[in-house]
Amino acid sequence: FIPGVSRWSPFHSAAFAVTESLPKLAAVGCDPAEARLTFQEYFERLGNKPERWGKPAAALLGALTAQAGYGTPSIGGKDSMSGSFNELDVPPTLVSFAVGMSKASHTGTALLQHSGSKVYLLQIPVNETTGLPDYKNAMVLMQAVCAGVQDKSVLSAAVVKEGGAAAAVCKMAFGSKLGFTFAQGLDAATLFAPYEGSFVVEIPEDGVLADSLAPYATALGTVNGNGIFILDGDVLTADELIAAWSSKLESVFPTDSGKSATVENVPLYKERSIFVSQNKVARPRVFIPAFPGTNCEVDTARAFEQAGADPHILVAVSYTHLRAHET
């Protein structure tokens, strides 16, 4: 989800939100074609203004188009239509989360691995007429990246968001404090355009990009072990970039409390014999009604059972007078 895109077109934003969540699965080695989605929607208070009602309608249609295009249904979500305070409104928001399963041995990372590795931008294919993702070919690209992550021919992979490929490369390098030398002659769009859902992938220094990935690829540069970033003669260190990246919200979500922590030496706990009373104790019975719109009855029953009670759940059915009476 990119707010700037959603202000321009809630329809396109929702379609690309799905197109961002599925590649994130592919980048860690999980087959996006087998994914399921869940959405989080957040919109301004609608009132009686038709143009406001049009925003969630457009967003949901965009998300539905993407679900049909990729063959990946949304099976859950949560929405809110109260994102207004006085004259302030939230941007039209539909965030997509993709969920899937993969073997631990197949999973990958977004962390750059080795000095000398080559890094490429794999741009998600877009329909030039509609400006929407080319769903069929986009899924082909996602599955090709997933296969590369699983067979380890792709050493690391990340998904492009705000800031473009340049920001993605930097964040991939921050964890290991590796540096990066950008290729000469890259234009601003290649580096900084928010090609949402596109990939940045690392392959070995002596490796060759797979034929299934080559049609989408633009060479971004090579990883260096110096902890410096070089772009058209400009040089910045990893520490400088990390400071700039993290300082934006430092006053809101501080990463440094300014206090030194005291580390206590806690000895290992050794389990001893447990003595259980031979005397019988009362086991209270607990009635837990589950009404329409409520939840957590199973968790509540489990908690009572662990405390020694005998819980009983009754689902209150009220869709007819007879069923309500039976309940």
Give names to the regions the model predicted.
Residues 8-83:
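A glycine-rich phosphate/pyrophosphate-binding beta-strand-loop-alpha-helix module
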Residues 21, 63, 145, 169, ...:
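Aromatic/hydrophobic pocket-lining residues that form π-stacking "cages" and hydrophobic walls in ligand
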Residues 200-204:
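Short hydrophobic/aromatic beta-strand micro-patches
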Residues 320-327:
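Conserved small/polar residues in nucleotide/adenosyl-binding loops
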Residues 2-6, 51, 56-58, 73-195, ...:
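Intein/HINT protein-splicing elements and their conserved insertion hotspots or analogous self-processing inserts
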Residues 16-20, 164, 168, 299:
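Short amphipathic alpha-helical face segments that pack within enzyme cores
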Residues 174-175, 298-314:
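Short helix-loop-beta junction
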